[in-house]
């Protein structure tokens, strides 16, 4: 296991880590010796990711969690503490969008659903994990937002609004957490090659590529490398960088 980031032996939760970005983050953390709690709503995917990490010599457990349900988030944090003794890193990756939808077709229930999935879930997980980080006077929280939070986009008002809220949540919590040596950061991810992207809109990638100077969309490993940078155990004052 690599250890030059100083994170070997730390305990991490990665929500939505059964595939895509979350899987990439979980596997990258494990490669550096972090003990990872894989969490997903799809048990087959989540168990497979955890098993894959263990097969490569890493430490990982799986916990089913619907991040829209407060009691399940609380149970996830409690299970992690039971298994690993604490929570050092919380990666709020779980969330998602849907196929493009005109804003005037959005009813209250659909808008609320995506706010709860993308924004409330991060808030609830931080609230549950924070006491453990505060007690040990250290912690790293990384929230995953989206480029749509900054520049918007047609037919995604509900998703963009929720992800913009994640940025506001992060900057506010970063100020409150800093006195306890807890960093809270947000990564504003670009279009990333994940199964969810292709399921939501199979033609989107082809339309997007000509607009990207490098000619490729991001890979989960690109996001994972950003997470590794933010959780490294070196002095940093970038408690609210994005």
Residue ranges, per PLM feature:
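Canonical Rossmann dinucleotide-binding motif of NAD(H)/NADP(H)-dependent dehydrogenases/reductases
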Residues: 4-37
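Substrate-binding pocket helix/loop in short-chain dehydrogenase/reductase
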Residues: 101-103, 107-112, 197, 208
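Conserved small/polar residues in nucleotide/adenosyl-binding loops
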Residues: 235-242
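Alpha-helical segment proximal to the catalytic Tyr-Lys
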Residues: 131, 175-179
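Residue(s) in the substrate-gating loop at a strand-loop-helix junction
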Residues: 146
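A conserved structural motif in NAD(P)-dependent oxidoreductases
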Residues: 212-223
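Active-site helix of classical SDR
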Residues: 126, 162, 170
């Amino acid at each position: 296991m690599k250890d030059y980031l100083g994170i070997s032996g730390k305990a991490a939760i990665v929500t939505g880590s059964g595939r895509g970005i979350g899987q990439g983050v979980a596997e990258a953390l494990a490669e550096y010796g972090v003990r990872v709690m894989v969490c997903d709503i799809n048990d087959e995917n989540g168990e497979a990711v955890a098993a894959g990490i263990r097969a490569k010599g890493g430490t990982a457990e799986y916990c089913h969690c619907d991040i829209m349900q407060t009691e399940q988030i609380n149970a996830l944090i409690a299970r992690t503490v039971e298994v690993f003794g604490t929570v050092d890193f919380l990666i709020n990756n779980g969330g998602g969008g849907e196929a493009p939808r005109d804003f005037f077709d959005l009813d209250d229930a659909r808008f609320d659903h995506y706010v709860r999935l993308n924004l409330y879930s991060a808030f609830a997980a931080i609230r549950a994990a924070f006491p453990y980080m505060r007690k040990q006077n250290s912690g790293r929280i990384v929230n995953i937002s989206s480029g749509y939070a900054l520049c918007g986009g047609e037919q995604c008002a509900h998703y963009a609004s929720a992800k913009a809220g994640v940025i506001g949540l992060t900057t506010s919590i970063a100020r409150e957490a800093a006195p306890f040596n807890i960093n809270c950061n947000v990564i504003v991810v670009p279009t990333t090659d994940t199964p969810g992207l292709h399921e939501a809109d199979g033609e989107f990638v082809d339309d997007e590529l000509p607009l990207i100077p490098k000619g490729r969309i991001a890979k989960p490993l690109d996001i994972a490398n950003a997470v590794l940078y933010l959780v490294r155990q070196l002095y940093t004052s970038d408690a609210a960088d994005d």
